[in-house]
Amino acid sequence: MAKKISIGSWAYVFNQKEEISFHKILHGLEDLKLDGVELGSFGKHPTPRSHPTKASRDRLKKEVADHGLAFSGIAPDLWSFKLVSVEDPAPYLAAFLGYCTFAQDLGIKLIRVDAVEPPSIFEKEKIDPKVGFDRAVKAWDVACKMAADHGLEVSWEFEPGFAFNKPSEIVSMIDAVRAMGNSNFGAMYDSCHAHMCAKIGALQPGEKETLAGGGIELLHNLKGRINHVHLIDSDGSLNEHSTSTHNPFGTGHLNFDEYIPELLKAGIPSDWWCIDLCFWPDAWDVTADSMKFLGKLKEKYASIGA
């Protein structure tokens, strides 16, 4: 299937001199002829609170379509909740359910999750990592079943700054949640996070676990387990928010002529490639170049499915 290109709207919320409104972003992305936008439901961008009624959500859905765009997914704001350090994830799940309804009303088919708490949580709170792992599995089991009721895939974005950031943990988490009957659960393969987790081993607690083949070897290990893709470069560093620096394409260390063919062979069911400029200062200034970079790769590898 031919790939469609979107960009995460959170790029224009976080770490910017001034937050760019969602409506202005839609105009800009339409002018750049992107295929879609991935909704970062944060700040002044659309949230269940800013669009509380079905009518307001219908208007938002139409607004996006009127700009020639589609939603590639949604990233909900769940960072005020806990997942690993609590026995009862009810507050997290209640908020997640609200976002499921919001996503369904907007016609969105995929919702993002992360582990919410840092990898240091186990030592800090004296939690057995296995207990924390099991808590996440049980919570995401419920989340996946709620999401399925709303026609949603659940995509876990593993990151160095969140718990379960070792390559073996990433594979094990996908398998454990799917083993509970959740075929709608999968990994979000973010190229910079994959590099930082698999090649650099950033922020890993205890003994560091890396792969000789870095992000591409992790991609191979996750074959059949990935349901969404975020693409951006990496210079091997963390930013001030303790997550991977999302370098614009061509300014980091990743060779996308190696990554793209492997991604196309990885059996990923999604036809979206989402550009992720999270926390990059003045993100709008590099948006057009990011689109052109991916567009050239799409054209170059069209014969094998790009």
Language-model-detected regions and their locations in the chain:
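Glycine-rich, proline-tolerant flexible connector loops at the mouths of alpha/beta enzymes
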Residues: E38-V64, A115-I121
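Alpha-helix N-cap and loop-to-helix initiation/capping positions
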Residues: K17-K24, P48-R59, E87-A95, K124-K138, ...
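C-terminal helical cap(s) of enzyme catalytic domains, especially alpha/beta-barrels
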Residues: W284-G305
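Active-site acidic/histidine proton-transfer and metal-coordination neighborhood
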Residues: H23-K24, G28, E63-D66, K82-Y189, ...
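Boundary/entry segment of secreted carbohydrate-active catalytic domains
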Residues: M1-S21
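Hydrophobic faces of well-ordered beta-strands that scaffold small-molecule active sites
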Residues: K3-S9, V37-L39, F71-P76, I111-V113, ...
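Active-site beta-loop-alpha junctions enriched in small/polar residues
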Residues: G8-F14, G40-F42, P76-W79, V116-P118, ...
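Acidic/histidine-rich catalytic cores of soluble enzymes
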Residues: V37, D141-P248, H253, G305
